[in-house]
């Protein structure tokens, strides 16, 4: 039998730990726990595993041997947290009662935390308490939930809210059970292990730090073999259990000490409550531990080093350290947006360990030790600060600011990075003290370790870093070295990577990469110098920046190396430090002028001497150094000096506030240039400065009396210029402060000089850029402006020095100032905000930008395209020129045709190819594309030649662009039409081969080079051309993220098309989809699966129907037609749907996890419907349905669709119970078959329906919209409601006809009547307060009067200032909602008449008239995107009233004179709101005609200018006649506005969209 370790808890050795101890479990239980009945309870997942089955067999055998008279029962609950409920507990208890179990029963709970908690609670209450044995099978359960006797079930209001303390008789921890654990669950459990060590045992924490790499390597391998780490794993579990057992023994009922076990849980549980089940408990606690450790640091209790150790240890186990962690965000998807400060605080307020509503957390004092051994009350303000990356810096208060202060900054970043490189290159062991623990050094340490350059460990609770150097013997590794935005590390490691040798088991190269900003920062001069010295270095993205691919085994040749050092001294230091390892001695000559930051070069040389290599300056050649060959000899101890750049911030604080501050460990003897800041900058500005060789003290003048510096050369301390700039900002004088010598600051984390100019302007301080510096015009601090929250306060550009500098100026303002991205200070001073708060007494407050959580843009994980340029590819005649122009119009981009660019440089393409051949042409073509993608990377549409994909170089460029998130759009049209067109085109080169052969060759290239695809259907008429443009712009909105529609919230239907070719029904599509919110394309039922045909089918849908497309490929195993075995084709066809920009992609959960994840990773802005179909009729009470639902949630699906099969009516009832319990994600759930029709009726979201106009039905038991509504109404789900048109006169109103037509078509039971009156009060008393009231259509004279009877207003109603639609507010009896749909009537009328969405292009509109409708017209034109809205009327006083009452961003101009009309920009859209029954005033007509004339004749217009007349009688009004016949404008009759506003009104009333054709005909019938 394997060794068993016993742990005592509450005086009993009842916790037994070992590996493979199942025989011991059986023998111990049956020997010592005598019973007539043993019940083993697990879940259905564990039930199927080999270890469980072995344990069951051994129990059965043991029972025969030890207790032959006893009974043994088994029970399996459904798995998952959602089944840890009172209902499941009752089911278990019913089973025990049915089996005749009595008080002597022994229950053995085998499973994870869910089983242990719930079955423990069963044991606590069954027969008033029976014995229980815990056999935990997950790491989390082994070290946490099974220990200590806590039992519980969840309730709808929270986790573990109903439970009891009930100690198990035994806890048997058999670590071999972990072989059944998925990798993620394994890692999840390590959070609790790290926690127990962090609060109790520093020695064990150190062991865990060292064990992490081995552990992760084993548990993430394809074939997990725990035997290789068995001893370490048992010790890991055992030590964690011992901690918890000690704590529980001292405090069983969690009255004091046991609260320590909740370290990380206050915040972690709050996060978990929001993101479960996508994120696991341990993952959330890991984030919680980091945040609670940061809170302890914020209080000044925990050292920054300890926080860094904790963060690094958690990260080493692949656990998240923030809610912004890349993997964490991928897992929780759009729920990231729900993690908001107020929500978290609300969750924390109901934590069980709180004192009433006072939030308490566990505070670490050191690794292995808790502060005062209790949980502490925490203010919401302090919590809000640590929970967000944005902070409000409150004004510095004289009463809370210490008059004198001593601050010790962290270790120098410059010295720390150099010390690590030298130590890794050196031989022997060095103990580095006061090393900066920051993002930069973390990346450096990780890189050195990855390259096997040194063995790295810690001492003194992490304060000392021990580096055992390998003498420069680095070898390649598998992974890329990610350096974040660590510029110093990237430049030093570029040369180090040139020294790396080849690891035969890995790559023959090293890749250095970083974040987006790092991939813009220059490294070119260094690379050029290294290339010239024998290194092979390749740029993988942008020329001159990371990522770099550096060939291993090349080394440095040595000899003379010339380097341009006018941009960065770090290039020089990089080569200096590595030069001793070159083949020959190095002579380093710095060319191109005086080197920048000479003091940092001197620092490097001095440090090299400390490590045993002496550099000599050439006595004759300026800026030239001789470096001997050799190996560094590591000193025993190396002390890193505090960071002089960081020291400038506390010193500047003293200068600005008139107080005193001492930095005790930086003085005149410092290696760092920034040590001169106090003497050279602050002293001349009026400060008293005392500087010894080792310390610096600054005392500021009285507040507000700083003097400007006429000129200061800060070349020796360039990083400190930002600090100097904010001090100069309040040096009030007519003389500006001029700072020079800082040109290198333009290529740091950001362009710091420009950043300082832009951000100072937000404070009302003028600053100007100089060629190598900045000039600042200081003002009185009392006159500082407060950067507005609306404009997002101070932007830090993710730059630590920008953030720290402006944190000082912010406190000088009269009101709090927002600083964004505050955590960027982690680069050099992770604890800066804590120092500001604790040492300087500054009030800080967390801030979070308000979000509309209903914004569909929050539901996607992809960033919107924004200003990023769009590349268009495709065959000639595919429509690239036209559609590229449409893209440019919509996006507001410039259009570049690369063929035109070529001809401007090289002449006619045909002639060039004749003279030079296709090969040379393709080479130049690729070069041009690369050039323009670089210099026109934003706000351009780049249209390419048809053969751009013929060149491999061009293909690589295009594919690289898609990988960086750029859009490469492939346009295509019917090939036969293309051939007809190209056969007659003599302006382009003839193809060597036939057109079809060319397409056959290029097709796969087009698909692999593009990430989006649009098929242009043939347009035979102007009307079809307009439809194409409208559908293309809708497509463009989807793929760029500019226009995303949310999942419907009310009852909604989707028309499921079972057609082999949609062209057969195209003309009837608008009628077919009546009443539906989406349309499903069943791709598997199409006659052809080729990309071109499938794309054509989506084009048909877009041409005839303006509805979201659901793209579905159903395999035969899931009731469809696509072959189950052709997985590769299924994946390609699914990805095609994403490229086609469909709104929804149906993904079958029956596919492999790898398949599903690969599709979801590419989904962009397409929503995912995670679908599972079981046509065998699996009961809805089975756990498999829970598993599928949770699987959909874990994939961050936007909608989950579960389809069963009904054998009996009861199946529908069971389904509704399931639906009621599964509300996290929108659910489509119904039963197929005749018996399942009721479930279709009861389904709320996107119910699949058919149409009476279709001959084929895609689903068994499918119904029409009308059938469902009628049935739902008959069973009481849809009550009859009464709607009215109110106002006077209304006798000729067509609203009753419009709404009634919609009711009849959709089988809605409602009634629409007229209620004629002039009095809103009468409407309220006699209509709105009556039972069955559904809503109002409001017309004159009541649109204003009715507003006092509504409780809420839509945005449109608020701005327009009138209501035309009223509905009762759901769940709020006696309260009503007011809306205005007139604006929608205008916009949709324009859209239906071919006016495209013009997005960011410059289109102007005009409103004629000054009545109530004019306000709706102005609102409509603004919604459409008009940049400027002109208004004209016979009398202008009303127009000025309208202008002043509407938002300023409507950009309204009132045209009063003819001169103003003539000076106006051309107008493309006009809405006439004047009566049509009398002629226009002549003066007004003159102005209107001039506008119409200029609109028609404007130079740049992308559509026919269009006029809409809001008057619907007569059908053709005088102004329409003038616009169309005299000036060639398109015109829209007012009846269209009436219908379109009614369509939205109908939807507001009923949640359904009425069939347009039916309601239109009802309105125009007899309406001439």
Curated annotation (Swiss-Prot):
**Shikimate kinase: annotated segments:** 867-1056
The catalytic site is made up of 254, 269, 824
- Cellular compartments per GO CC: cytoplasm
Q: How is the cofactor bound?
A: Binds 2 Zn(2+) ions per subunit.
CDD domains, sorted: DHQase_I (cd00502), DHQS (cd08195), EPSP_synthase (cd01556), NAD_bind_Shikimate_DH (cd01065), SK (cd00464)
Question: Which molecular-function annotation in GO is an example for this chain?
Answer: shikimate 3-dehydrogenase (NADP+) activity
- Which segments carry the region annotation 3-dehydroquinate synthase? 1-380
Transmembrane segments in this chain: where? Answer: none
The residues listed in the UniProt record as binding NAD(+), with positions renumbered to this chain, are: 43-45, 81-84, 112-114, 117, 137-138, 159, 177-180, 188
Locate the region Shikimate dehydrogenase: 1280-1568
Q: Which cofactor does it need?
A: Zn(2+)
Stretches the record annotates as 3-dehydroquinase: 1057-1267
Superkingdom of source? Eukaryota
Under SUPFAM superfamilies, the record lists: Aldolase, Aminoacid dehydrogenase-like, N-terminal domain, Dehydroquinate synthase-like, EPT/RTPC-like, NAD(P)-binding Rossmann-fold domains, P-loop containing nucleoside triphosphate hydrolases
Assembly, in brief, is: Homodimer.
Function field: The AROM polypeptide catalyzes 5 consecutive enzymatic reactions in prechorismate polyaromatic amino acid biosynthesis.
* Protein name from the UniProt record: Pentafunctional AROM polypeptide
Lineage, please?
Eukaryota, Fungi, Dikarya, Ascomycota, Saccharomycotina
Tell me what gene encodes this: ARO1
